A protein has these predicted regions:
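Extracytoplasmic
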Residues: 22-56, 77, 241-246
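A late C-terminal transmembrane helix in Major Facilitator Superfamily
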Residues: 340-376, 385-386
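Cytoplasmic helix-loop-helix junction between adjacent transmembrane helices
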Residues: 116-157
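Helix-breaking motifs and short loop linkers at transmembrane-helix boundaries and internal kinks
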Residues: 53, 85, 106-112, 123, ...
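Conserved MFS/SLC helix-loop-helix module at the cytosolic interface between two early adjacent transmembrane helices
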Residues: 72-111
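Helix-loop-helix hairpin linking two adjacent transmembrane segments in secondary transporters
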Residues: 112, 141-142, 149-195
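Juxtamembrane intracellular "pre-TM" segments in multi-pass secondary transporters
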Residues: 15-16, 198-228
Length: 414
């Protein structure tokens, strides 16, 4: 028994010793695959619509077909990773993603392209779950919040820089070149993970309890529920913007692909500032203060987008300006809420990360599917949906900070 405990201690120490820089690099390239897939095709919407003989608005369904399996698959990846480790899950998921990318690359019918997008989401769900889990394996407390803020700053680049690269590739080589790039990038990432990544969950720390018991244990915490609602709603607002803005900027305003891709980059400073502020505010004041400021920002950004829509207007400045403010708030909320949600679960990090990642992407997929039902003639539907998501995030945070009855307290971990 003493020998087992000593080996367990050594393995935990090895995991904790993984440097912040190296951990951030692994998480960044893993998450970048999935996030780049989500937005790289946006500047190509017009070209894809012409080739597949569908309307540009119909291509909003691509993001829904990608995000829904992306979210659902994380429920499987997370609990499996608590049992067999993180590395095997990452490698298997990336292999499935590569197959989906190749299907999308060679698809000549819209239905097959949607199948490819579905398989992509099914595979890269491993990245969504593990990007939240790896940091919890190695850090906790204030250090975990700091690491999550740093990771958030790195992760925002891929979904917003990807359209710039996608626009360039589309103009130079055609829209299919974006999916060739994604396939090659995923192959490079899986090789890196196989050769350089060390397992962050030691064998002695792996949970063998039934899946439903793991989910019940995590979801029984009222604060986790509130953080989850906040994260799902905030991310859904981001996803709806990413899906609709390309249609509005390219389809309604008639801007060229390169201009649309450059406009997508402009909200980046807002998110970076938010992720930096989240760490500063949490360190000098309280987590609650960071959450309030982030919530105020996403509400304000939603209103900036919605108000011109009430007048039947669609303008680039209100879309990008409102998105920048919304991204600022999201940058503050994401690391703070993720840290608050996962901190109580050191032995259920995979399950907790899977729930957060899975529900965020499932919620985003359903929100974009809902948004696709409305005509994309102006920015009013986008503004209304983003405002509704902000109000839902407010309700989630209210649940976090409302004291729960003693009977609802989270059970003691075994």
């Amino acid at each position: 028994m003493i020998l087992i405990r000593y080996c367990f201690y050594l393995e935990i120490t090895m995991s904790a010793s993984l440097s912040v820089a190296k951990l951030t690099f692994f998480i960044a390239i893993l998450a970048a695959v999935g996030q780049a897939t989500q937005t790289m095709y946006v500047p190509s919407i017009g070209y894809m619509a012409q080739e597949f003989l569908v309307s540009p608005a119909a291509l909003q369904a691509v993001m829904a077909c990608y995000l829904i399996p992306y979210g659902l698959s994380q429920f499987v990846y997370g609990t499996l990773s608590d049992r067999i480790g993180r590395k095997p899950i990452i490698i298997a998921g990336l292999a499935i993603y590569i197959i989906g990318s190749l299907i999308a690359l060679f698809a000549h019918q819209y239905s097959w392209f949607l199948v490819g997008s579905f398989v992509q989401g099914l595979g890269i769900g491993c990245g969504g779950a593990m990007s939240r889990t790896l940091s919890r394996d190695c850090f906790d407390g204030a250090e975990l919040h700091k690491v999550n803020s740093l990771i958030s700053m790195c992760l925002i680049f891929s979904p917003l820089v990807a359209p710039v690269l996608g626009g360039y590739l589309t103009e130079s080589f055609g829209w299919r070149s974006s999916y060739l790039f994604l396939s090659l990038f995923a192959i490079a990432v899986v090789i890196t993970m196989m050769t350089s990544m060390v397992e962050t969950l030691p064998a002695a720390a792996r949970k063998k309890e039934p899946v439903l018991r793991s989910y019940h244990y995590v979801l029984s915490d009222r604060r986790f529920q509130g953080y989850l609602i906040c994260l799902v709603a905030t991310f859904a607002g981001l996803a709806v913007f990413e899906a609709a803005a390309g249609v509005l900027l390219g389809g309604v305003l008639g801007l060229p692909a390169t201009t649309v891709s450059l406009l997508f980059v402009l909200p980046i400073p807002g998110y970076l500032a938010g992720a930096w502020l989240s760490n500063v505010i949490a360190r000098h004041w309280r987590e609650k203060t960071a959450m309030r400021i982030g919530l105020l920002a996403i509400l304000t950004g939603s209103l900036v987008i919605m108000l011109p829509g009430l007048l039947g207007l669609t303008t680039a400045w209100s879309l990008i300006g409102g998105a920048t403010i919304y991204f600022l708030g999201a940058g503050i909320l994401f690391p703070a809420a993720t840290t608050g949600a996962l901190s109580p679960f050191p032995y259920h990090a995979g399950t907790g990360g899977a729930i957060l990642g899975g529900m965020q992407n499932l919620g985003a997929g359903l929100a974009t599917l809902f948004a696709a039902m409305f005509p994309a003639s102006d920015q009013l539907p986008l503004g209304i949906i983003m405002l509704l998501m902000s109000v839902l995030a407010l309700w989630g945070l209210k649940r976090v900070y409302t004291k729960q009855p003693p009977s609802d307290e989270m059970p003691i971990a075994i």
